[in-house]
Amino acid sequence: MSQTPSSLCDLEHHSAFVERHIGPNDAEIAQMLEVVGHASLDALTDAIVPGNIKSPAPLALPEAITEEEALVKIRAIADKNTVYRNFIGQGYYGTHTPKVILRNILENPAWYTAYTPYQAEISQGRMEALINFQTLCADLTGMQIANASLLDEATAAAEAMTLAKRSAKSRSDIFFVHDAVHPQTLELLRTRAEPLDIMLRVGTPEEALQAECFGVLLQYPDSFGHIGDHAALADAVHAQGGLVAVATDLLALTLIAAPGQWGADIVVGNSQRFGVPFGFGGPHAAFMACRDAYKRSMPGRLIGVSIDAAGNPAYRLTLQTREQHIRREKATSNICTAQVLLAVMASMYAVYHGPDGLTRIARRTHRLAAILAAALRGAGVTVGEHFFDTLHVKAIDADAIHARARAAGINLRAIDSEAVGISLDETTTRADVVALAQLFGAMADVDALDAATADALPQGLLRSSAFLTHPVFNTHHSEHELLRYMRSLADKDLAMDRTMIPLGSCTMKLNATAEMIPVTWPEFGAIHPLAPAEQSAGYAQLIDELEAMLVECTGYDAVSLQPNSGAQGEYAGLLAIRAYHRSRGEAHRDICLIPESAHGTNPASAQMCGMTVVVTKCDANGNVDVDDIRAKAEKYSDRLAALMITYPSTHGVFEEDVVAICEAVHAHGGQVYTDGANMNALVGVAKPGKWGSDVSHLNLHKTFCIPHGGGGPGVGPCAVKSHLAPFLPRAGLHAGEGQTAAIHGGGFNSGSGSGHSSRIGGMVSAAAYGSASILPISWMYVTMMGSAGLRKATQVALLNANYIAKRLAPHYKTLYTGRNGLVAHECILDVRPLEKTSGIGAEDIAKRLIDFGFHAPTLSFPVAGTLMVEPTESESQHELDRFIDAMIQIREEIRAIEDGRLDREDNPLKHAPHTATQVSASEWTHAYPRELAAFPLPSLKQQKYWPPVARVDNVYGDKNVMCACIPVDAYKIPVDAYKEDAEA
């Protein structure tokens, strides 16, 4: 050990987290640099990144601090938020998160570090949880099918509008909106409708009877608590060839008639009150349920039931051809990331409580609301007659009531000068009812009122149908049972707590525990998104500081944190471009150039903005074809709105001509949109806002360490240059703005952050700051890494990708390389030649990797028949070598097929993955040994992941669509009988 004295500064080791986040240590980095042929990280960076885009100076951010120091700083920020008792409602309600779910789902990396379940065989656990969610939503709404989550209720309502437009027989362009929908829903509908030339008409349900429209949106119960009977309206809309969409409350539906019973075609809502905190607006799992006839037009992911190679039931993503990554500009939606982790929490909440427990919670909530209403009426206060949990209190001095409430630490909903709203929930107590009554000068003897007060639900709309009858909702009601059920599901899956997930273009990096800790603090979780601004001063500081960090990292001038996914960030950026052109009298600019290699969300988002997509070519080296871009920019010069590019490219290279590309587009009046999906190769090295790009979205769930959660949540900030800043999404309604302001399009606040007051763009998320409660994760990451740490992380991401490419070069060709034969942060392995010589394709390799305990790389994107590998900076040399060894062994197995030592059909790749049941069966029918199937490398005998199912049959799953909980008997009957049952 060295005896050299160390300074106190050295011993304080402020950069300790940097060494925890970055996988390889300095000695390993030196070894890996030797393999790739460069002397230092700076030399490697210079060899990869074009000189004309490199940043001349370090990031102007503070240097790194320790985890403990960062937690102290963010605790001080959190303490500036003030937690009041919230009765605001408006789509957000208090709830108790069962501690067993908090600890074993939300705080469990087996759940929050998983990726979207594209690889079905290693995703069976979370897909079972999601199919429980789908069953929950379909059962309560009375619909036939539900999806696996959407971003928020307002977004879901907008998706319902476009689904109705696609599917209705009516050719009308009018969509009728109930004037008692939640205000944030109406605002987002306005954003979505205008670029698509959809006319919104807002009014009462009675007025809807006179409208010739392709669809209506009703709120049930409505935003003020009223429960209306809309059956006649539904019949009238159907008679005109329109569809009926309903925004609803899942808890209320345990007591009132399901929308499907009285004529709804599409039902949307938010599952937030099923165990997920306010979180200043998110993240929460919304949902869409609909009639079976519309399933192929639904947005978002659908979990379906198929069978595996052994004939056993198995889950998979079904009907993927609807989605943006396949249909691109023809997709039903740009939805990509949704809210899987929150959907899992909501589903487990339903599993834990079961139908009886949910009904009890609903009845208790309603009972307290009825008692409060009776107390208020006894004091001469006017309240609504029929309601579930929300009272519309009228004919009062609202300002005086709010003043008393604030003095008592209570928030009520502001409606207008003579009315307030009071929404009760699972957390409401008897003492709360007494305190609320006192605000109005009323006395509440809860027991006496309980004995004397009838329920306030309309008798003609009481629920009569059963729900959640499947055993999964009627079994796991003790904590032990739920704990073991959740553990059994987690054990079926591969997440980053077990292995690297080398998905190209997905950036599956470390989600550090210290980053996650503040998410569960009540100072962040218990703030209602419409609470008065003075109660969210901590959030204001957090948002300002995080926006400033992102501005510095990107070189742009302004950032909006409202988009709650990358796709929504894209949409916000393109809307800003569209609004900018219109502000200059150039509304005719509607052409969006998009390279053929682009992410599928790019063209899907462009068409949602009313743009016409023109695809540009890529050259033989994987670069965007600059000449083709120039030619098409000139051809469409008068109409050119934007070019969308990804940088580094989706082909894993830094293109040399990005500056020239930006100049060419600007010369013809267009704007440049740089997709920030690959920002992990740029932070601290280059800034898109400085090389000519006008706007980017970022993925905080990639580059800035928010976990993927199995398919969400995410945050997709939109960053822009100053000329586009006014057109970023506005922050939403004041806490004190009522329904009238929303209906007439007024009443927008200045938001928490600097410069937000001048923003006039349409809202793209229900809440002003989207998924605000997970923003502390990215703040913590940047704060703990510091300027130098962020740059080093980028450099090691480049090193790790090139190390893999170099070591695998004798075995697999890297399809595209950039300058000096190097890749960016990911590499595409071309396995197409192997299919010609052995019959083994990319999917076979992906499935065989499961036998080695690995999640597959990105399959057949952006080039069919290839594998795209992105290791990120967080994987150690040991883990990289483990993956490389697996890929080399797979190449040896392919060589054995080529040489005739393994059969072309009966080989371990064609039959991968292998389950424990298969390899331990008394009969083994394959021509290769069991040991090769199960333990292709000796190290696997020490630690082995066993997939729960064999290879899943995708074709069968799409032909036999079943998206609800599997009947228990399906696990017992022969496969042929199961097929017949599914087909029936």
From Swiss-Prot:
EC number: 1.4.4.2
UniProt cofactor(s): pyridoxal 5'-phosphate
CDD domains (UniProt xref): GDC-P
Record field: catalytic activity: N(6)-[(R)-lipoyl]-L-lysyl-[glycine-cleavage complex H protein] + glycine + H(+) = N(6)-[(R)-S(8)-aminomethyldihydrolipoyl]-L-lysyl-[glycine-cleavage complex H protein] + CO2
UniProt entry keywords in alphabetical sequence: Oxidoreductase, Pyridoxal phosphate
Pfam family for this entry, one: GcvP2_C
Disulfide bonds: none
Coiled coil: none
GO term, biological process aspect, one: glycine decarboxylation via glycine cleavage system
Oxidoreductase keyword on record: yes
Cellular component terms per the entry's GO annotation: cytosol; glycine cleavage complex
UniProt KW Oxidoreductase keyword: yes
Residues the record lists as N6-(pyridoxal phosphate)lysine modifications: K702
InterPro entries from the UniProt entry: GcvP, GDC-P_C, GDC-P_N, GDC_P, PyrdxlP-dep_Trfase, PyrdxlP-dep_Trfase_major, PyrdxlP-dep_Trfase_small
GO molecular function: glycine binding; glycine dehydrogenase (decarboxylating) activity; pyridoxal phosphate binding
Family matches, as NCBIfam families: gcvP, PRK04366.1
PANTHER family: GLYCINE DEHYDROGENASE (DECARBOXYLATING), MITOCHONDRIAL, GLYCINE DEHYDROGENASE, DECARBOXYLATING
Assembly: The glycine cleavage system is composed of four proteins: P, T, L and H.
HAMAP family: GcvP (MF_00711)
Record family assignment: Belongs to the GcvP family.
Function of the molecule: The glycine cleavage system catalyzes the degradation of glycine. The P protein binds the alpha-amino group of glycine through its pyridoxal phosphate cofactor; CO(2) is released and the remaining methylamine moiety is then transferred to the lipoamide cofactor of the H protein.
Protein's name in the database: Glycine dehydrogenase (decarboxylating)
